[in-house]
Every structure is written in structure tokens, then in C-alpha cells.
């Protein structure tokens, strides 16, 4: 609808958004990543919790993330209903940008840094809402249902729909249980998968492939699992290949692909079959999103 209006008028109707500050305190433990942070936030606030808001992410755990981790968090703000998400610029931002192809040249660099510093939120800024998340006890998070807010820690029991007080949540959980074939009290550990997919705009960056390759080194994909690695851009693909990461994936049994959206939205032949389960680094697990309506997606 908005595309139609823009083409017809050259304008878009937009309202001023509220700003919600999300402070992620503490530090992430081993095996816990930026994706786990944003899945936890969506679990706590809901898939509609950010409607009418922009999310500002801060706190110790966010400051400790590298730039690509911050990008992963901001990327999924929309999955929580927010119009946008951002992290205030700091030295991590500037180090990431400096020397890149489209970054300001050395003669203009200091001028741009001064400008970026000027648009940071003030130390005494007032927000429409402030939410706190504790990263110290955060575990790897996975979705158990059919939207990005139906999330649990990987070793945490899946919630019982009948124990939910909210009628809307209860109905949504019942639908998810039927689709995902769950039983109350089970965990996602041991939930068999048929397909493993690493890539997309959420987790298709160089740092993602470096970390996955580190874990894969010396291991092999099960013969019954179809595994794909799809870099998020051609730049990422060439960087991975320059470091030899593609060979690690191939030797482990992954298909190494050119950049693209691939299984995120069942592009071309990269489609989930009926009854298949996919472990996916993407951002959406809606019914039919990745292929057959009877396929099941687990985000992680």
C-alpha cells in the first residue's frame, strides 16, 4: 500500500516515532551472540511491542559487540514491531568505517566524526520508555513457534499454551504447537532438523562465517541433513574465500553458494519441503515463509 502511495504522490505518510531505550547490561557468555540478544528482546517485548517506536540499544553488552553484531541486533528490530533500531556511534563505529570504500577520506574524517558525535543521544536524554535486559545469564535462544517472539533458551522447557493467561498468546501458541508438533515441557534440544541454513541479511556477515567455520573445523554434517552456506553479499563471499572459509564449509558437507536471499524466502529451488525442519540463521519463521506450508523453521 505504501509503495502505491509513494508512486502516486511522491510522498509517504509518517508519524513521529517514540524512542524506547533498551539497556543490555552485563556481558555475553561463551556461545551466546548478538542474535540471542535480539531474540531475547523480542521474547520479552513481543512481536508488536515496538509498534510506534524506534529502539535505541545501549548498555555494556551492546558496547562490547563488534559492529557486525550490532548490525544483527538492529536488523531484527522490525521483527519486534519497531520502525527502526540503532546504536549510538562510538569508536567501534569509527574503526569499522575508516578506510572503507565509501567512507570519508582522511582529509574530511575528523569533520565527519565531529558530526557523528553531535548526533549521539545526550547523556541526560529523556526517552519515552526504558527497558532493561540482563546479558549475564543469557543462554543461546531458539524459536519454538511460528513467529520470532515465540522463543526459549535452547535448554528451557517450551511453554504450555494452556498455562498462558493471555487469550491471544494462548491461541497463537496452540497454533504453533500444532504446526511444530510439540508437547508441553519438551525442550528444543534434540529437535531433529533436515536442513541447516547459514546466511541472510541477519547472519550472513564475515564474522558469522568465521565463527561458524571455527565451530565446523574437523566436524561433518550428518548425511541426512542438507546444509547451505549463503553469504549475505558478494563482498562477504569474496572475503570468506580469501580467508579459505569456503573450504572449511565444503569439507564439512555444506554447499557453498553465491550471495543471495536463498532459503530466507524460498528463493528458486532453495525451498523447505513438507514436513521438513530447518535450522535457520534468518529472521522470520512464519508458516510458508521458507517453502511448503507444512515445513517448519527454527530460528537461531
What annotation goes with each model-predicted range?
Residues 1-300:
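Fe-S-dependent hydro-lyases/dehydratases of central metabolism
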Amino acid at each position: 500500500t505504501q509503495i502505491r502511495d509513494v508512486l502516486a504522490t511522491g510522498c509517504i505518510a509518517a508519524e513521529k516515532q517514540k524512542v524506547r531505550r533498551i539497556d543490555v547490561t552485563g556481558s555475553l557468555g561463551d556461545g551466546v551472540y548478538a542474535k540471542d540478544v535480539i531474540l531475547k528482546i523480542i521474547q520479552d517485548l513481543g512481536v508488536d511491542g515496538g509498534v510506534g517506536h524506534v529502539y535505541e540499544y545501549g548498555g555494556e553488552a551492546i558496547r562490547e559487540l563488534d559492529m557486525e553484531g550490532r548490525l544483527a541486533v538492529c536488523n531484527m528490530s522490525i521483527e519486534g514491531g519497531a520502525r527502526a533500531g540503532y546504536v549510538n556511534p562510538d569508536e567501534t563505529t569509527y574503526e569499522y568505517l575508516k578506510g572503507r570504500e565509501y567512507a570519508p577520506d582522511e582529509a574530511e574524517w575528523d569533520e565527519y566524526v565531529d558530526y557523528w558525535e553531535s548526533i549521539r543521544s545526550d547523556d541526560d536524554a529523556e526517552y519515552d520508555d526504558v527497558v532493561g535486559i540482563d546479558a549475564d545469564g543469557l543462554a543461546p535462544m531458539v524459536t519454538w513457534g511460528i513467529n520470532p517472539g515465540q522463543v526459549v533458551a535452547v535448554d528451557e522447557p517450551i511453554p504450555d499454551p494452556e498455562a498462558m493467561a493471555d487469550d491471544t498468546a494462548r491461541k497463537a501458541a496452540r497454533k504453533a504447537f500444532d504446526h511444530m508438533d510439540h508437547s508441553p515441557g519438551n525442550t528444543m534440544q534434540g529437535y531433529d532438523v533436515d536442513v541447516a541454513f547459514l546466511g541472510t541479511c541477519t547472519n550472513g556477515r564475515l564474522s558469522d562465517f568465521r565463527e561458524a567455520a571455527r565451530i565446523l573445523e574437523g566436524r561433518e554434517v550428518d548425511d541426512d541433513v542438507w546444509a547451505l552456506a549463503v553469504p549475505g553479499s558478494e563482498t562477504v563471499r569474496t572475503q570468506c574465500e580469501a580467508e579459505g572459509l569456503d573450504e572449511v564449509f565444503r569439507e564439512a558437507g555444506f554447499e557453498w553458494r553465491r550471495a543471495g536471499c536463498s532459503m530466507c524466502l524460498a528463493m528458486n529451488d532453495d525451498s523447505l519441503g513438507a514436513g521438513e525442519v530447518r535450522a535457520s540463521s534468518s529472521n522470520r519463521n512464519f508458516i510458508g515463509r521458507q517453502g511448503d506450508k507444512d515445513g517448519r523453521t527454527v530460528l537461531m
